[in-house]
């Protein structure tokens, strides 16, 4: 029997080496991540909200909007894809329905958080949490809904800021008991907190590396030495894209050309190389084989 992508992802997550999963916000960024050699892709919730809606990470995206972006990403890469499922889009039955929809789109897992819906970015102020009991109900609904037992359910808690680290650890243990396969404890403040979480939670751990966020910005080797199993980078791609685009189009408005921008940056990609990101040669070959003129 062939090994599924869900099984492959689980094996990577549980391997001795940390699994580094950059975050895509659309099909193009997912393609680039795969071509850079990473074994999996994470679909960022904040980047999806920004790229699809032009709105901040405050719970604006719906299940259907997430599924559209997911489908485009899953169809364009061959590696396993996981996603940010926010707070589950409602109650436990909303989680049940979302799990079915997302799994059938083709992802191998997601992370689900214990914030009140609509949620807020984990590194912003003003987060409100649901009860432990409500969250464990959501996790149990997700476990029931998944069709492949290897589909990975990552439980995120934002309790560190609201209630302290002790409560965040307590909740994390409850979430593991409810069936979570991995724990994502958001917004830890220093390395000592990260080490304590590793010591006190008997489950794989996800590290959320956010530029300018509250958690220390560590290298993958440093995270691995602490004992983290998985690292995601939800802002990196779309923050870089927004920064570069702003500089590029400011140059165009002020100078009337983009030439100086490319000269300063050093043109790293030719026109031909750009098209090969999308496998132009392969698609052209298929077109030549299959597209025939009508008589």
UniProtKB/Swiss-Prot annotation:
Q: Does the keyword Transferase apply?
A: yes
Name any one GO molecular function. Answer: carboxyvinyl-carboxyphosphonate phosphorylmutase activity
Q: Kind of enzyme, top EC level?
A: transferase
Taxonomy, superkingdom:
Bacteria
Could you tell me which InterPro entries the record lists for this protein?
CPEP_Pphonmut (IPR012697), ICL/PEPM (IPR039556), Isocitrate_lyase_ph_CS (IPR018523), Pyrv/PenolPyrv_kinase-like_dom (IPR015813), Pyrv_kinase-like_dom_sf (IPR040442)
Q: What does the record say mutating residue 70 to A does?
A: In strain: ATCC 21705
Answer yes or no on keyword Isomerase: no
Q: Any idea which UniProt keywords this protein has?
A: Antibiotic biosynthesis, Transferase
**E.C. numbers:** 2.7.8.23
Q: Which CDD domains match?
A: ICL_PEPM (cd00377)
Similarity field: Belongs to the isocitrate lyase/PEP mutase superfamily.
Function, in words: Catalyzes the formation of an unusual C-P bond that is involved in the biosynthesis of phosphinothricin tripeptide (PTT), also known as bialaphos (BA), a natural-product antibiotic and potent herbicide. Catalyzes the rearrangement of the carboxyphosphono group of CPEP to form the C-P bond of phosphinopyruvate.
Q: Which PANTHER family match?
A: CARBOXYVINYL-CARBOXYPHOSPHONATE PHOSPHORYLMUTASE, CHLOROPLASTIC, PHOSPHOENOLPYRUVATE CARBOXYLASE
Q: What is the protein's name according to its record?
A: Carboxyvinyl-carboxyphosphonate phosphorylmutase
Source organism (scientific name) = Streptomyces hygroscopicus
């Amino acid at each position: 029997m062939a090994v599924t992508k869900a099984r492959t992802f689980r094996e990577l997550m549980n391997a001795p080496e940390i699994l580094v999963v950059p975050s895509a916000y659309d099909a193009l960024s997912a393609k680039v991540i795969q071509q850079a050699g990473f074994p999996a892709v994470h679909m960022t919730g904040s980047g999806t909200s920004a790229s699809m809606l032009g709105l901040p990470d405050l719970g604006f995206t719906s299940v259907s909007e997430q599924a559209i972006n997911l489908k485009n990403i899953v169809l364009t890469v061959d590696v396993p894809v996981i996603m940010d499922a926010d707070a589950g889009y409602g109650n436990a039955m909303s989680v049940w329905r979302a799990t079915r929809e997302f799994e059938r789109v083709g992802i191998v897992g997601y992370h689900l958080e214990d914030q009140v819906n609509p949620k807020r970015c984990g590194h912003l102020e003003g987060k409100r949490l649901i009860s432990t009991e409500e969250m464990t109900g959501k996790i149990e609904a997700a476990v029931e809904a998944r069709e492949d037992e290897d589909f990975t359910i990552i439980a995120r808690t934002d309790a560190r800021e609201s209630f302290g680290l002790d409560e965040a650890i307590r909740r994390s243990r409850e979430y593991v008991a409810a069936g979570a396969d991995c724990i994502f404890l958001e917004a830890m403040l220093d390395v000592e907190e990260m080490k304590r979480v590793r010591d006190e939670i008997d489950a794989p751990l996800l590290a959320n590396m956010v530029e300018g966020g509250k958690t220390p910005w560590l290298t993958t080797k440093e995270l691995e030495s602490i004992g983290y199993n998985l690292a995601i980078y939800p802002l990196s791609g779309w923050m870089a894209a927004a920064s570069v685009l702003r500089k590029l189009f400011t140059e165009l408005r002020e100078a009337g050309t983009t030439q100086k921008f490319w000269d300063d940056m050093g043109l790293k990609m030719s026109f031909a190389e750009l098209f090969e990101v999308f496998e132009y040669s392969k698609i052209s070959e298929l077109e030549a084989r299959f597209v025939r003129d009508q008589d």
